[in-house]
Curated annotation (Swiss-Prot):
Catalyzes uridine to pseudouridine isomerization (pseudouridylation) of specific mitochondrial mRNAs (mt-mRNAs), a post-transcriptional modification necessary for their translation. Acts at position 390 in COXI mt-mRNA and at position 697-699 in mitochondrial COXIII mt-mRNA. As a component of a functional protein-RNA module, consisting of RCC1L, NGRN, RPUSD3, RPUSD4, TRUB2, FASTKD2 and 16S mitochondrial ribosomal RNA (16S mt-rRNA), controls 16S mt-rRNA abundance and may play a role in mitochondrial ribosome biogenesis. Keywords: Isomerase, Mitochondrion, mRNA processing, Transit peptide. Residues 25-53 are annotated as: Disordered. This is Mitochondrial mRNA pseudouridine synthase Rpusd3. Its main location: mitochondrion. Residues 1-36 form a transit peptide. It catalyses: a uridine in mRNA = a pseudouridine in mRNA. Forms a regulatory protein-RNA complex, consisting of RCC1L, NGRN, RPUSD3, RPUSD4, TRUB2, FASTKD2 and 16S mt-rRNA. InterPro entries: PsdUridine_synth_cat_dom_sf, PsdUridine_synth_RsuA/RluA, RluA_PseudoU_synthase. It is found in: Mitochondrion matrix.
């Protein structure tokens, strides 16, 4: 796949307005899902669109370094001075094993594509592999250090700097609140999982149990699902997925922690986290009809968790924070339209 082909691919797939359900604005995220026109395409371009495992999902694992660099170059939402902000596709890890395609592995090619050949980019802030959204890069170590100090100080003061949006299977009750739960990492079948610790001892804390805290606010509801705003106040792997599962409302596309939520006679409950293995998320038939998905597509459903907003320090010590926004990915906008999730 050449560079021209990748750029055309990006224009077809990585657009915030791409969708396939009713034309209607989503819940306040500044994107719109439209039924795309069907221009004549070559068979290769047609295959790129039609063989996607989930509608509107960009599969970065099928790209090479140069191709991914072009995709990320097209995903840049802001570039000022040493700072580069881009909208990361879902499924792209920040780090990984040697030879694995990651955000770090593509930074040299991305720097060249941005005209920064002699300036080394480093990651300042980024969502995890399964989430999409804002990635903050810097070519200046001093700027990166200043930003890291700002984020650390904000966490200590419990001032959220990151705002995610998520679609949940189920509607959290109450509609807003705070989830506070100690978590630890535990390996199960060679998979590292975040596990709640109800009453951690001093020994637990010494062995790595961390207090985690997140705020949530339901922005819209529809078809038994919710569009939820999430603001983590601590940093822990998979914190938001675990917190939503604890609310009995797992995030759509969470094929790791959704299995902890069981249902008996229409009532939801939590399975023991220590003995519940990750498995593909199971959705009821009515929800599948609303989403217009085939069984094979459901198995490939991406995590509907998007880092939508970041606050950065102002230029002066007394200046208010500045704001960065990233539009929703196409599959996320499509889901909002199919579930009729509009701002209430």
């Amino acid at each position: 796949m050449g560079a021209l082909r990748v750029l055309r691919y990006v224009s077809m797939i990585w657009r915030p307005e791409l969708g396939s359900c009713a034309r209607q604005r989503d819940a306040g995220f500044g994107t719109e899902a439209r039924r795309p026109s069907q221009p004549h395409r070559s068979s290769k371009h047609k295959d790129l669109v039609e063989d996607q495992p989930f509608p509107g999902l960009l599969r970065t694992e099928n790209l090479g370094l140069e191709e991914l660099a072009h995709v990320l170059r097209a995903a840049v939402v802001d570039q000022k001075g040493p700072l580069v902000t881009l909208n990361k596709p879902q499924g792209l890890p920040v780090t990984g094993r040697p030879g694995e395609l990651t955000l770090l592995s593509v930074l040299p090619q991305l720097s060249q594509a941005l005209g920064l050949e002699h300036q080394e980019l480093q990651v300042v802030r980024a969502p995890g592999k399964e989430a999409s959204g804002l990635v903050l890069l810097s070519s200046c170590p001093q700027t990166a250090s200043r930003l890291q100090k700002f984020f650390i100080h904000s966490r200590r003061a419990q001032r959220p700097t990151a705002t995610y949006c998520a679609v949940t299977d189920g509607i959290p009750e109450p509609s807003e609140g705070t989830v506070c739960m100690p978590l630890k990492m535990e390996q199960m079948n060679d998979v590292d999982l975040a596990v709640p610790v109800m009453s951690p001892s001093r020994k637990d804390i010494q062995e790595g149990v961390k207090r985690t805290l997140s705020r949530f606010h339901v922005m819209a509801t529809g078809r038994g699902c919710a569009l939820v705003q999430l603001q983590p106040l601590t940093v822990f792997p998979n914190q938001l997925q675990v917190h939503m599962a604890l609310q009995l409302c797992p995030i759509l596309g969470d094929h790791t922690y959704a299995a902890r939520v069981g249902t008996v006679l229409g009532q939801r409950f939590l399975w023991p986290a220590e003995t519940t293995k990750p498995q593909r998320q199971v959705l009821d038939e009515a929800l599948l009809r609303h989403l217009r998905l085939s069984p094979s597509q459901v198995a490939q459903m991406p995590l509907h968790l998007h880092l939508h907003r970041l606050l950065l320090p102002g230029t002066g010590s007394r200046d208010p924070p500045s704001e960065l926004l990233a539009p929703l990915p196409p599959y996320f906008s499509r889901t909002l339209q199919c579930l009729r999730l509009s701002q209430q």
